[in-house]
Amino acid sequence: MYIESKDYKIEIKFLKNWKSDSGTYSVSKSWMEYQKDFDWLFEEIASGKKSKRAFVIGWFNCVDSISKIMQLGKGRGCRPKVNEERVAYFPFLKRVDSQTYAADLEYYYDVAYQKQSLNLIGRDNTGRDCIFLGNSDDVFHFAIYY
């Protein structure tokens, strides 16, 4: 979305998955599709447009794990271990133990509606923030990156 008169640019993505005939779930897009959007936002922030750029992700809260709709694991298979570089983009997720599998990630609702700074591995994280909008009873969740 682009509001030319204000020079606002907002990238919006809707997360969804699909269930195959065999009963397994698959995410709708590869991680690289989202990585491109994060990279675009961070380049815009670095060029001084923090207050004019955002990346919004929305999804229905209808699956037992966000990993059913977003590739947060490393490797293939039905229970991949968490990819630390990817999970760093989601400060509103928590691990249940140190050897966490992507399917075991849970929402950390205590930080919902609060600004969270991103702590990305190997990157300058200055000015990279996120707000998670949702609670366990909500039908739809949002993550706004700015």
PLM features: residue spans?
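Phenylalanine-focused residue identity feature
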Residues: F14, F38, F42, F55, ...
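Conserved catalytic cores of phosphodiester-cleaving nucleases, focusing on short active-site segments
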Residues: M1-S22, L41
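Nucleic-acid nuclease catalytic cores
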Residues: E44-K74
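Residue-identity detector for threonine
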Residues: K13, T24-S26, T100, T126
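Glutamate identity and glutamate-enriched acidic tracts
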Residues: E4, E11, E33, E43-E44, ...
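Mg2+/Mn2+-dependent nuclease catalytic core
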Residues: N17-W40, E44
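Non-catalytic C-terminal interaction segments of nucleic acid-processing enzymes
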Residues: K68-Y146
